[in-house]
Amino acid sequence: MVFSNSDDGLINKKLPKELLLRIFSFLDIVTLCRCAQISKAWNILALDGSNWQRVDLFNFQTDVEGRVVENISKRCGGFLRKLSLRGCIGVGDSSLKTFAQNCRNIEHLNLNGCTKITDSTCYSLSRFCSKLKHLDLTSCVSVTNSSLKGISEGCRNLEYLNLSWCDQITKEGIEALVRGCRGLKALLLRGCTQLEDEALKHIQNHCHELVSLNLQSCSRITDDGVVQICRGCHRLQALCLSGCSNLTDASLTALGLNCPRLQVLEAARCSHLTDAGFTLLARNCHELEKMDLEECVLITDSTLVQLSIHCPKLQALSLSHCELITDEGILHLSSSTCGHERLRVLELDNCLLVTDASLEHLENCRGLERLELYDCQQVTRAGIKRMRAQLPHVKVHAYFAPVTPPPAVAGSGHRLCRCCVIL
């Protein structure tokens, strides 16, 4: 480390230590480390634990080894409130045990992609980090039900838990978790493919504060599970059911009758959902802001009519691969309150019946920011150009296949490659 010969710089004389610490608190990690090399006085100030309450090592993930985490934990101690180790694949259980012992006031911990960690890390967190509120274990594939039992015993203040792609988790783990962590507000279970309806029943019984639930690709879930959730979690605002291919309109009915605060619904690839279900949903869930209905192949313009009438706050809508949607449905959407005032994103990829007429209707959507039109075969470059003349700020994503080369001139058919000619 390179220090100056004197610590008697003017700034150190004029400003009290408390003010210098306050200034340093606004600096990022890299800048703090640079300041630490200026002088001995600044080294002490820059590495003061109070400046290291929030640490994000994502930009250095390939270089972060366990000893780095251990050193940070010793430096920060009880000051550290938030740490992100997202993508730090070199960090394992031993380092995180040291971290947990030293940083007992941690509230927000991101271990997304830390594939070396196992249940041992969760035991350490349970034992030492009782103030933990936010924990991300995405893709920590060695985590099992034992981790959830430990967390439920020692981290009862937990409000957010991401277990996406932790595919060893089963209903037994979820039951243990929710019995202890009854204040959960967000639970993300994407790709937890072993979960069944019974897991959702446990959530219904214990997580009445839940506002966000992600069940993407939990392919064993049926209407029974969704109905249970809706009956117990009336505060639900965001629900992802994408890839839950067993679901029918019964799930939408339960949502409509029990979850009036719903703002986000993702139901991509739920191919059994129909206009009837979305009609009941729209008539009861007036707070809807974002909907992903990609590959809901049975819905028609009727769904868009109901959304136009009853969902004035709608901002983002995906209808990709909904091949029964026509210009008529887009007309209703664009003429509605949400079309005029709120709509920002509309995805219409592979809507084969949509034509340039829809683009004319969408000129009414003055707030539109992004429009997806891949493989809309009846939409033309000219139509897009006319719309962008009216909405110059909108980003239009489309693809037009290269022009097919003209047929060969008469008499030149059945041409052979040079090798064949030689042979």
Swiss-Prot record:
GO terms for molecular function: calmodulin binding; phosphatidylinositol 3-kinase regulatory subunit binding; protein phosphatase binding; ubiquitin-like ligase-substrate adaptor activity. InterPro entries: F-box_dom, F-box_LRR-repeat, Leu-rich_rpt, Leu-rich_rpt_Cys-con_subtyp, LRR_dom_sf. GO terms for cellular component: membrane; SCF ubiquitin ligase complex. It is a lipid-anchor. A motif (CAAX motif) lies at residues 420-423. Its main location: membrane. The gene is Fbxl2. Residues 80-90 are annotated as: Interaction with Calmodulin. This is F-box/LRR-repeat protein 2. Part of the SCF (SKP1-CUL1-F-box) E3 ubiquitin-protein ligase complex SCF(FBXL2) composed of CUL1, SKP1, RBX1 and FBXL2. Interacts with calmodulin; may antagonize substrate ubiquitination by SCF(FBXL2). May interact with PIK3R1. Interacts with PTPN13. Keywords: Calcium, Calmodulin-binding, Isopeptide bond, Leucine-rich repeat, Lipoprotein, Membrane, Phosphoprotein, Prenylation, Repeat, Ubl conjugation, Ubl conjugation pathway. Residues 9-55 form the F-box domain. Pfam families: F-box-like (PF12937), LRR_6 (PF13516). A lipid is attached at C420 (S-geranylgeranyl cysteine). LRR repeats lie at residues 61-87, 88-113, 114-139, 140-165, 166-191, 192-217, 218-243, 244-269, 270-295, 296-321, 322-350, 351-375, 376-401. CDD domains: F-box_FBXL2-like. It comes from the Eukaryota. The keyword Ubl conjugation applies. SMART domains: FBOX, LRR_CC. Calcium-activated substrate recognition component of the SCF (SKP1-cullin-F-box protein) E3 ubiquitin-protein ligase complex, SCF(FBXL2), which mediates the ubiquitination and subsequent proteasomal degradation of target proteins. Unlike many F-box proteins, FBXL2 does not seem to target phosphodegron within its substrates but rather calmodulin-binding motifs and is thereby antagonized by calmodulin. This is the case for the cyclins CCND2 and CCND3 which polyubiquitination and subsequent degradation are inhibited by calmodulin. The modification Phosphothreonine is found at T404. SUPFAM superfamilies: RNI-like (SSF52047). Changing T404A: Abolished phosphorylation by GSK3B, preventing ubiquitination by the SCF(FBXO3) complex. May play a role in P. Aeruginosa-induced surfactant deficiency by inhibiting PCYT1A in a calcium-dependent manner. Phosphorylated by GSK-beta (GSK3B), promoting recognition by FBXO3, leading to its ubiquitination by the SCF(FBXO3) complex. Ubiquitinated at Lys-201 by the SCF(FBXO3) complex in response to lipopolysaccharide (LPS), leading to its degradation by the proteasome.
